[in-house]
């Protein structure tokens, strides 16, 4: 097999746009252009790059299913058979006093609502007790070519493939028992579950305005799955395929082609190669509703409406801390509820 079959290539127009967004050109390109025009151009550039990334993934996926990619193994190091596990990761360690305020809040909520699951919290040191990655992965982490955010994409897949369970990002807030949610998500049908984009979502413009980098219902958009929350049985076909394809990517690349390249991979797999493995679609705006109200005045009735829809909530730690918590807001309510 020719090596270029599994190499990624960027959109040429996207590359030019990326250069123009750097010094010194950005002072002319960005600052002098009307904001609305600049935004439209960036959106178009993003869709062009998504298409280029999808085509690169297609070449790798085809080589993978034809048996032309190198077999790269990850080794589990524990026997956890029969145990229901919530997996979480925070690279620098889980000493509570050193965690960001939002992570502290989510930490306590997971402990409260774990139900019949046990929580295994991993960091850069103790993860080695559970999973062994190829040396090239660890080298890329050490030399900085793979950031911890994208390493965690690999870690979640490896753990779920080897042991099964539930992956929760450290910024996931729970307001109900996890076991109750796993039943409603229909995990038993496909053996895994992730929230996905739904064409029947209401208030699409609201969500696109809230986070235009992630939310879009444009037909060109290929970012349509949330990987912050993953339920999976051990040895699930989809999770295993995602893991092997991501390992193939990192074996041959040292730079991500798009922040959501994992999501683009999943979109290609379920759209073209493994449509029968697509899990139940549950709207990926649902885990974001609570955070969209985070700094608004707290309402018991509104909270009830939100938690009736989902008990799993995606928060963010960026720019959010007790220091800027607004009194009587939803954030203030949860800080007091969990004594953070």
What residues fall within each predicted segment?
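Glycosyltransferase-associated regions of secretory-pathway enzymes
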Residues: 1-152, 170-340
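Active-site acidic Asp-centered loop
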Residues: 163, 168-170
């Amino acid at each position: 097999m020719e090596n270029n079959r599994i190499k990624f290539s960027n959109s040429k127009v996207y590359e030019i746009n990326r250069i123009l967004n750097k010094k010194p050109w950005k002072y002319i390109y960005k600052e002098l252009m009307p904001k609305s025009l600049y935004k439209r151009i960036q959106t178009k550039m993003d869709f062009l790059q998504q298409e280029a990334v999808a085509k690169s993934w297609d070449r790798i996926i085809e080589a993978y299913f034809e048996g032309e990619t190198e077999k790269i193994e990850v080794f589990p190091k524990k026997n956890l058979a029969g145990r229901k596990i919530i997996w979480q990761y925070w690279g620098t360690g889980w000493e509570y006093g050193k965690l960001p305020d939002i992570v502290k809040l989510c930490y306590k909520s997971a402990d409260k609502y774990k139900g019949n699951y046990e929580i295994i919290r991993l960091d850069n040191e103790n993860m080695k007790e559970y999973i062994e990655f190829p040396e090239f992965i660890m080298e890329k982490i050490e030399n900085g070519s793979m950031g911890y955010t994208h390493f965690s994409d690999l870690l979640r897949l490896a753990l779920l493939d080897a042991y099964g369970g539930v992956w929760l990002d450290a910024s996931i807030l729970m307001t109900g028992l996890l076991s109750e949610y796993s039943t409603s998500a229909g995990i038993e049908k496909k053996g895994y579950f992730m929230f996905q984009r739904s064409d029947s979502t209401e208030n699409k413009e609201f969500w696109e305005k809230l986070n235009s980098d992630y939310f879009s219902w444009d037909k060109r958009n290929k970012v349509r799955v949330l990987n912050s929350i993953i339920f999976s049985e051990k040895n699930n076909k989809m999770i295993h395929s995602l893991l092997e394809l991501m390992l193939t990517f990192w074996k041959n690349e040292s730079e991500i082609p798009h922040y959501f390249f994992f999501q683009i991979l999943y979109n290609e797999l379920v759209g073209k190669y493994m449509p029968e493995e697509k899990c139940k679609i549950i709207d990926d705006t649902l885990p974001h509703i609570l955070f969209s109200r985070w700094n608004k005045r707290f309402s018991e009735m509104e909270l009830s409406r939100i938690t009736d829809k989902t008990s799993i909530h995606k928060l963010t730690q960026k720019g959010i801390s007790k220091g800027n918590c607004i009194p009587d807001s939803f954030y203030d309510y949860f800080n007091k509820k969990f004594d953070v």
